[in-house]
Amino acid sequence: MKISIVDIGSNAVKYKIFDANNFQLIEYYREPLRLGRDVFNGGKLLSSTMNRLINLLQDYSDIFNRKQIVHRYFIGTSAIRDSKNSDLLVKKLNNKNINLKILSGKQEASLLKSFNEDIPNSA
């Protein structure tokens, strides 16, 4: 069984696929979208940026479908958390059956710390 984790960050959107039995990293991909440029300058995602993000996440979801990955985690961090229109993004993604979890700053720090300490080859 495999699991996938998608990290939607300020500079890039990354996914990692792990073997759930031994947490060995199987695949990694990074796409620079620079979401922070919109959010930190204008307070929200521009519609063009949001559409690029939605299309990318749909592409990732399609990849996970082809690889028969059932356990998928789409995680939004700082840029999504700080965006004034993150609720619209969540709604649009829900319409595509993509469940986005937006982490608080404290949750993000705690999760990344434990993830990097507990799972080999996760950095």
Write out the residue ranges for each language-model feature.
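Nucleotide/phosphate-binding catalytic cleft detector across ATP-hydrolyzing
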Residues: M1-S10, K16-A123
